[in-house]
């Protein structure tokens, strides 16, 4: 997979980028495994490695390029279980990037006009099922069309937050605000 280039985005302290390839998967799983060993949770280590491998396959299937997440301790900061994935998106021939996003979601897409151009945003919440019952996932999508007339191409970022059904709603909203703030730093180069 080639590197995505032509943009920059600022992540908070303690966040890392992982490419969605074999090297990135190994690096991520090693990080998760190391953390679980530090916590003395070998059973959880095995479950999380299996879950991470399954999730990595899904990311590969959707042609996700990279994920960003908080994976390092930073004194004075509390990290929420938020991750952000990025992938290239090309609309079907004869369509624009914005119109092509309809193939990704049934949620309402809202357009925000900004100094760098329109930002397309949509969100949805999915309740947990089966083994994940009681754990919801709230996701927010952000679309950035290439800054060219009637562009069919652009980038899609998806921020995802997993949380228990009884989580403090203020913390959930704070995580979504953090994702919105991160996306506000996006710039084409």
Residue positions per predicted region:
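Short, well-structured beta-strand
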Residues: 83-189
